[in-house]
A protein has these predicted regions:
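Short, contiguous alpha-helical
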Residues: 7-18, 29-75, 117-210
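Helix-adjacent hinge/juxtasegments
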Residues: 60, 65-107
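Acidic catalytic patch
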Residues: 104-119
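Membrane-proximal, proline-rich intrinsically disordered regions
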Residues: 24-26
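Active-site rim elements
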Residues: 1-8, 82-90, 130-133
């Protein structure tokens, strides 16, 4: 199927979202980029936005509604857990995005090429899905920057990080926190079982260290 790459990309992107969330601690949820500036979303608000906005895009633009039968979802705030803790956000997003993935796998080329409403314009569903993936990646990047501001280690999200050994050109490895989403949820529910990081090593881990 011509658009299988979009389904495959969503399958991995949803895991990357939960993986980044797993790097935070519960006490981090109220943290904003600047403590005295309410314009920047807190960690908790980023999780809320991801859950709510993805639900709205899929429901209203792609016609995929996975929250209609959820018993643990607040009616006034679709796609949100009843308790807004780090673990509950991860479980809720993993469950709902898994249902969306299953629905996407059933769609044919005609569905992907059909037009839908994107705010005030018409676009193909394939176009909307591409934008959705980029939107999610944007907010995930914001959270990764906040992890650095908090002084936290970072496992891989796409490729090497400073904590997996540094730069790609120096052959630093890609090390994910967990081997699968299932292992992630099980490990975090047990208090955390992330794969150990080797650290920065003896080479520069950024492009212009001076």
């Amino acid at each position: 199927m011509r658009y299988a790459f979009l389904v495959e990309t969503y399958a991995t992107e949803r895991v990357k979202v939960v993986s980044v969330w797993s790097e935070f601690r519960d006490e981090d949820l109220p943290v904003r980029p600047r403590e005295d500036d309410p314009r920047g979303r807190s960690v908790q608000e980023q999780m809320v936005h991801q859950c709510v906005s993805e639900n709205l895009w899929f429901r209203d633009m792609l016609g995929i509604d996975v929250c209609a039968s959820n018993t643990g979802v607040l009616k006034s705030a679709p796609a949100l857990p009843r308790q807004e803790t780090r673990m509950e956000f991860m479980k809720r997003y993993a469950e709902d995005s898994g249902k969306r993935l299953a629905a996407l796998r059933e769609k044919d080329e005609m569905w992907w090429e059909g037009n839908t409403k994107f705010f005030d314009v018409e676009r193909s569903r394939a176009w909307v899905m591409t934008r959705r993936i980029a939107h999610t990646s944007h907010h995930r990047g914001q959270l990764m920057a906040m992890l650095r501001m908090l002084g936290r280690d970072l496992h891989s999200n796409y490729g090497p990080t400073a904590d997996t050994g540094g730069l790609m050109q120096n052959h630093a490895p890609t090390i994910y926190a967990y081997a699968s989403l299932e292992e992630l949820l099980e490990g975090e529910n047990a208090g955390g079982r992330k794969i150990a990081l080797p650290g920065t090593g003896n080479k520069a881990v950024t492009e212009r260290p001076e």
